[in-house]
Design a protein with these regions (language model features):
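ATP/nucleoside-binding phosphotransfer catalytic cores, i.e., glycine-rich phosphate-binding loops
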Residues: 2-21, 40, 244, 265-355
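Hydrophobic/aromatic beta-strand patches that form the interior of the parallel beta-sheet core
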Residues: 28, 103, 132-134, 255, ...
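A residue-level signal for conserved active-site and pocket-lining positions in enzyme catalytic cores
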Residues: 81, 197, 255, 278, ...
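Catalytic core of DAGKc-family lipid kinases
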Residues: 120, 124-254
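Glycine-rich phosphate/pyrophosphate-binding beta-alpha loops
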Residues: 190, 194, 254-268, 331
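ATP/NTP phosphate-donor binding region
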Residues: 1-105, 112-123
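Short glycine-/acidic-enriched loop or helix-start segments at secondary-structure transitions
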Residues: 113-115, 143-144, 266-267
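Short glycine-rich anion-binding loops that position phosphate/pyrophosphate groups of nucleotides
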Residues: 35, 107-110, 136-139, 191, ...
Length: 355
């Protein structure tokens, strides 16, 4: 890993970027040096080749006006990415003529910290900012693309700013989870088996070599209902006008809602393979679980009889047993007192670059 090469390459690309043309650009790279894209040799070599290629491609664009030289800041632990972003938000409030580009150079955890800070920023400040999420983690489900080249294309080609919603989990007032912080996801928020896999993977981090997520997917497919009772959930789906789309009562292994369709989680597991943003998976025998598990990886599960897939703005659900929820890798245990709970798209708030 050569951080000097990394920052110099991005600085040179930003110097010729087409983001916010006609305005001074302030570019800050927030780097998590512990991210897999830096520490895993094969990934770093691939990123080095791509950065070299795009450093050369950027030269075809004219040099742009920068407010100052590109700044790079290393994170130093959990929450650091959010703290750095909040400092940039404070600075941006004082300099409305400048466009602030935050490049998140880390994994999905770093991306989430940055976007959480942006979510809470004043709207007039967010309108002068954008975040670019490089695929420098191991899974990269929350990056702008799993391909480094496709993300860097957003710097050297004409782009516009598009505001993306988040997904918020709300729980019953007075329940055990209601006093916690805001529950937000910027990719997929899920309840049930996947949240259990995420919870166990988090517990194993640093203790087991290799991809423990895939290990726990295999374990959960066989034994999840030994850990948590899979019982009926009452589910109600609503559109953005609060009109009911569908309601049902099923024993569910999984309930997942994405910011949009065409989204992956768990290291590119293709749970939302088309335009629809909600996927529910019913309880089923073990042999069916094993069959569907392999189909989810390739996004071929949508026509299975155990799968309910739809578009919704809000999903309300209630049950009578504890169940885990996960928000982009962070988990919370929902108790019966937390129901009814809901997953809902927020207003569009996260400024992203789009071609």
């Amino acid at each position: 890993m050569d951080l000097d090469f990394f920052t110099q390459s991005l600085a040179e690309i930003c110097d010729h970027s087409l983001v916010a043309p006609g305005r001074p650009l302030d570019c800050t790279i927030i780097i998590n040096p512990a991210a897999g894209g830096f520490t895993i040799g094969s990934k770093w070599k691939s990123h080095t080749r791509t950065l070299t290629e795009y450093r050369q491609k950027a030269q075809a664009n004219p040099q742009r006006t920068m407010s100052e030289s590109v700044n790079s800041i290393l994170t130093d632990g959990r929450g650091s990415g959010g703290n750095i972003t909040r400092a940039l938000i404070d600075e941006a409030q004082k300099k409305p003529d400048i466009f602030y580009l935050i490049i998140s150079a880390g994994g999905d955890g770093t991306h989430c910290e940055i976007m959480y800070a942006l979510y809470n920023a004043p709207a007039h400040v967010r309108s002068n900012m954008a975040v670019l999420r490089l695929p420098l983690g191991t899974g990269n489900d929350g990056a702008d693309s799993a391909s480094m080249a496709k993300v860097l294309d957003l710097l050297i080609n004409p782009v516009h700013i598009e505001f993306s919603p988040a997904i918020q989990l709300t729980t019953a007032y007075g329940g055990p989870a209601s006093g916690n912080d805001l529950f937000l996801a910027f990719n997929i928020l899920s309840v049930g088996l996947d949240a259990f896999v995420t919870h166990m993977t988090n517990k194993m981090k640093g203790k087991v070599a290799g991809d423990s997520y895939k290990l726990w997917v295999d374990i959960a497919a066989l034994f999840y209902d030994r850990f948590y009772k899979v019982d009926f959930l009452d589910v109600r789906a609503l559109d953005d006008k609060n009109q009911e789309i569908l309601s049902f009562r099923e024993k569910l292994l999984l309930l997942a809602m994405g910011v949009s369709g065409h989204r992956t989680y768990g290291s590119q597991q293709n749970i939302l393979p088309d335009d629809r943003n909600v996927c529910c998976v019913k309880q089923m025998p073990i042999h069916r679980k094993l069959a569907i598990k392999s189909q989810v990886t390739k996004g071929r599960h949508t026509n299975n009889r155990e799968v309910i897939i739809l578009n919704a703005h809000r999903i309300e659900f209630s049950g009578s047993h504890p169940i885990l929820a996960q928000m982009d890798g962070e988990t919370v245990l929902l108790q019966p007192e937390d129901f009814p709970s809901a997953l809902e798209l927020t207003a569009p708030v996260i400024p992203l670059l789009k071609m």
